[in-house]
Structure formats: C-alpha cells, structure tokens
Amino acid sequence: MEKYRKTEILQIVEEEGVEFIRLQFTDMFGTLKNVAVPVSCLEKAMDDRSAIDLASLNGFAKEEETELYLKPDFSTFTILPWRPQNGKVARFLCDVCTEDEREYELSPRLILKRALEKAEKQGYTLEVNPECEFFLFHTDDDGMPTTVSHERAGYLDTSPIDLGENTRRDIILTLEEMGYQITSSHHEIAPAQHEIDFAFEDALSTADKVMTFKMAVRTIAKRYGLHATFMPKPRQDVNGSGMHLHMRLLKNGRNVFTGENGELSTDGEAFLAGILGHVVGMTAVFNPLVNSYKRLVPGFEAPSDVTWSRTQRNALLHVRKRRGEGVDLELRSPDCAANPYLLLALCLEAGLDGIRKQQKAPKELTEDIRRLSGEEKKQRKIQSLPDNLGVALDAMGQDLLVREVLGESYVAEYQKMKRREWKNYLEQVTKWELEQYLYLV
C-alpha cells in the first residue's frame, strides 16, 4: 500500500470531503471491529489518542487493561469507495496499544509483525498470494441470509449461467480502486461459489487486505440483494470454501524455494517440512469454526491428511512451479474464517523452524490419496488432520511452537473461548438427530 505522511492524509481528507473516519482493528478471532470518529477528531486519532473500552469484547482485553488505544497505520489509509460521495468515509487499520504506547500482546497484528521482524533479522521476507472463496446466496423477504441460489453454474462457467458475474466484477473494480492487485477471478465448482485471487505481496499487507476484502465483498454483494458468506461449509452436498495460501520466501530478493533447474530447493523442502510438522497443532487457527471441519473431509477437494506433493493437487501442501516465477508452496487447508495475522505468523515461524533444523520432508504423495485405504495410510505413516474443533484445540495446547508464537496468554484465552463454542455445539439437538431417532427410539 502507498505510504502516507500525516500532512498528506489531512490534505486528502480535506480535498475529498471526507467527514467520517473508521478506526478498524481485528479481534483475536479474526473479526473486524471499528470505532467511527468525525473528521474533526482526525488529528487526535492520528496521534494515537483514541481510547477504546474492550471490557465487553470477548477474550481481547485483560481485566486490568480494559482501556486500550488505537494507533492508526498510515499506510492503510483509504477512502471507502462504496460510501456516499457526499460525506465520504475513510478508514485506517490500527494497532492496539496500551497507555504507555506498547503494542498490546493480545493483538493479532502485533503477533504477525513480531514474526516478520524475527524473519527479517535472518534476512527473510515472506510473500503471500491468497485465493479467497465465498458463496453468494439469496436473502429472504426480511433480508436475512439463506443458503438458496437459483444458479447452477460450475467451475469456470461464465454468464448467463454464472449469475454472480456482475457482482464479482463490481467487487474487483472496487478493490482495485482501493489499491488491490487482483490477478484473477472465476466461478468455483459449487453453484453460487466464487473465487478472487490476489497478487503476491508482503505478509502484513496481505493480512490487512484479507480483512478489508471480506468487508468489501459482503458490502458489494448486499447492493445486489445477495448475501456473501465465507462460511467454510454452508451446504453439505457441495464443496466448501477455503483460502488457499501460496507462499514464497525471499532472501536478498531471491526466491529461497527455487533450487537448481527450477525445482524445490533444500531450504524449500525444510520450510515445507516445518509446516507439516506443526500443522496439526496449528489447525485450530487455520480452521477455527465448528463448521470448518465439515469442509475438511474426503470427496470435496479439501485436504484431510498431512501430505505434500508436486503432482497431486489434493495434497495439503502442493509444490507449484510458475513459469518465470519459480516455486511456491500452496497450503490448502485454511479457510477464510481464520485470523489472517495468526495464520501467516504461524506458517512463517513453522517454516523457518524447519529451515533452522534443516528438516527433511516426509515421503511425497505421488498418487491420488482418495484411493488409499485407512490401513495403507497407516502403513505409510500418513497422519490425519484433526476432524473436529475439540481435537484441534487439544493439539494446539500440545504444540510448543504454537504456544511460543502466539504467547501463552493468547493460547489460553483462545482455547477457553473456542472450547465454550465447541461445548455449545455438542449440546445442540440437531435436525439430523430428530430425523434419525425421534420415530425409531
């Protein structure tokens, strides 16, 4: 994103007739929050003097630190294109700070910045290209979201079959107006499912843009009378929505993952091995919802086992060669419910842990894993991903690297809140149970 000085922002605000400023930040679970201030308070806000009471925000603030401060990142300043042209609205993404101007330890953005600074000291820069999938559903007569769509389009279909094409195009034009580089978009496999892909960018900018992207997509969809959802598996009978991450690691401007003859390098293999070694413990962050695990099942093009491959695109980690760009690693398990700051921090730290230890990757998957029986997987020592949120939370607490990267306080609070969510789910009496047992028992 373009870097702005304070004086430049004040000038733009005056020239563009901006009247409101949104001070946005991300909570520990990846939800975008904001405080709106009138333009008369802009200078005060830019001097980090916007206090927020976080006592009612689950898990974010400790009892002794319920009042914190928002520190705008000037590089994230943008005017929101979908707001009225009279009385425009702009926004900053903010870091959360304590009264003594320290960045707050439970701030997800701080956790990623800390990981990036650590990598930078070793000469590394992480670049990421996310592929974000979502559904566009109809709303009911009261404007509430449904899982209904009259569309029957499939992979790469176009209009008039793809009924969401105009919405998707408007989303992209809006994002480009906000400084995004969009490399492609298309209809996905399931009816009413869409994908928009970003260009490679540094990890912090990517995480910031993912947060803004979700807000923009939902806002533009609403203009068309549609509800955009990033829920991983809103319908049982079709593919779910993920957020595949393409990653490359640079050192002195060179792609570390690309070795001789354009193949995966030794350090690239070690980075890959580091992620595979910790992915079970990181899954509660990559896939943070009860619903996330209904996507990670065989038969719907989502990974359910800890595998890597150059040729099998259903593997958890796919090694991809791009013409003229070298090798990148595609991680296929995360979904858009994940907090992108935590997601990228964990990927980077786990990968660098692999490089530091010069780890070797497990045996490469060279055939379709769907053809392997459970016994064959066991013989090949292929580990499964957690199959529910409860198992994932247990694994999270047992992974020392996850606890080190996120911090013990963060992990404890995250587990507490998510276990409450998991327990609440387990206590529900579902429609399936009633259909199966009410008549028979």
Region annotations inferred by a language model:
Residues M1-V441:
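Glycine-rich, acidic/polar active-site loops that bind/position phosphate-bearing ligands
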